[in-house]
Structures are given as C-alpha cells and as structure tokens.
Amino acid sequence: LFRSQEEIRREVIALQDMGHKRLALEAGEHPSLNPIEYILESIQTIYSIKHKNGAIRRVNVNIAATTVENYRRLKEAGIGTYILFQETYHKDNYEALHPTGPKSNYAYHTEAMDRAMEGGIDDVGIGVLFGLNTYRYDFIGLLMHAEHLEAKFGVGPHTISVPRICSADDIDAEDFPNAISDEIFSKIVAVIRIAVPYTGMIISTRESQESRKKVLELGISQISGGSRTSVGGYAETELPDHNSAQFDVSDTRTLDEVVNWLLELGYIPSFCTACYREGRTGDRFMSLVKSGQIANCCGPNALMTLKEYLEDYASEDTRQKGLELILKETERIPNPKIREIAIQNLKAIAAGQRDFRF
C-alpha cells in the first residue's frame, strides 16, 4: 500500500525513465485500505504524469473481484485490461487455500470476469497459478473459462498469464507436489497458443532468462522487463525490504538488457498501446485478430514505439541494434501506403515528435 499519491507519482516517473509505456496496477483486498476510490484516484494520478518524453499510455488493473458497478467505474477511469487470476479452478482446493476473507467465495471470484464484461470492460486477462492443483485440471479450467467468455460475450480473454509456483517469502516451491517441470510448462504454453490463438500470452520475471527464451518460441507474446515486486521498488535507489516482495524475481535484467536480448533473438520489442486508444478492444479486436488484419497495425506500431524507446532511453548498443532491425522490418511492411506513412512517422520521431499510431 502506498501512503500517498506522491509515492505513486515517484514510482511512475521511475518507470517512465526506464522507458515503460504501460503498467499493471496491483492492489490488495483490504476493504478499507484499498477501496475502489483509492484505486480510481491512483489511476488518475498515473495517467496525469508526463515526465520528459515519458507517459504511461495504458494502465492495466489487477484488483480483487468486485461488483458490476465498480467495474463500470474502472472502465470510465480508462483502464486497459482488467486482470484477475483464478489461482486454481478446483473448488475444494481453492476453498482450502482461502477459508476466510474477501477471496473465500469461490463462485464470486470465478464469475468476476462476467461481471467485468457486464460493467463494460471488454479486455480481460485470466490465468491460473500452475502448481496449486494438478496442471491438467487447471489447464482445462482455463480453456473452458476462455470458451465461456467468448460464447457469452463474443469476446475471449485479451490476455492469458501462465505463472507457476515459485519461491517467495515463507514459500518453498518444493512444498507443492503439483509444481510443474520446465517441460510441462513449455507444453502448456504451446497448447494454449494453439487453442486460443487470438490471445496475448504473458510471462513474468518469475521465470529465468533461459525459460523465457524457450517459451517465446512457443507462443508467449508479452514479457516484463526490469520488474520489481516490492512496494516502492522502482523509486528506491536500493531495493527495499524483501518482506514486501510478492515473489522472487528470477530474471533480474534491466529493461534495456531485455530489449537488447530480444533484438539479438530477432524479435521486435514493442511498446505499443494503440489498440486500446483507438477503440480496438473487445469484439472489434477479436475480429481483427482472427482475420489477421491486426498485422496491418501491429507491425508498424511496434516499429514506431521501438523507435521512441531507442531515441529516449536505450543504451548505444541497444540503439544500434534496434535501428538496424527497424530499417530491415520497415521494408517488409506489405501495404505500400502504410509503409510510406510509417517511414515518415519514424523520421518525425527521430526529429523529436512522439506518439504516432495506426
């Protein structure tokens, strides 16, 4: 819990100075310490901060299951994706893990995405914590949840996250008999990508560099970089007390090191937030993704946002690698008109302008 909006402001500026354009706002479940008004004020604070060339263009929110009315208020505040992990779909195991407190109602938690959709949020992110139960059970539950949302609302999950049990304060992964191996983890990622081809798949810094490299090849499309899981961890010059850490970070590289690594692997590191701001969400996003038409936007937007990062935040080595990739990938844009506009926008970014998008 941040004690003031000024503390949040310092964290946001630190993230902007790293080069981030989006963030996930995560809050606890205490009804009086984390009321919806506090969340809404924090979102407003985050969007208001413009530091140098930095700006957070998309705020995703991960808070406890709440009411349709509160989801409506989050939508009105301009959030990107509402994220909530099921943890496990196995009802008995879930209730054993949460015998009391706000999360103890299995049905209320499981139906949160329905209420979010009813409240107007059409980009939702789901996930389970693999290792709490047998992976096959939770894997099927995850796919059934995605299928249910698409059948009922015409919109499947915008993102699926695949965290697995890892060590943290007072938690030893070896104490969980259902913890999954690297091989099974890779198989889960691959099959989700085949079964839910339209979704963004997220992997965090829980996973090591080696693990992240492997699953990038299998369908992961979003990764974090430079993450810190302690309250105030970005603004502090030294890491704060690890007692506030949500989990231990395995990949401790800076954002620039991650971007450099992705460039070496031949990927285009994208900082794009265009779909959210152009209204390409929900069923509109689904239709564009399923038809493949979204590629007309994704490629050029990725190159333009990468160019912004290279101009404002990158090390010289990363900058040179990025410029070489942009030059190569720009020529591969299939639509001549879009390619021409992208080239002009890239030149404008080099001259100091920002925030172009298709």
Give the ranges of each region predicted by the language model.
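Radical SAM enzyme core and accessory elements
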Residues: 213, 218-221, 227-358
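Generic secondary-structure signature for well-ordered alpha-helical cores
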Residues: 17, 48-51, 118, 148-151, ...
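Short low-complexity, flexible loop/linker segments enriched in glycine and/or proline
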Residues: 37-41, 97-101, 138-142, 218, ...
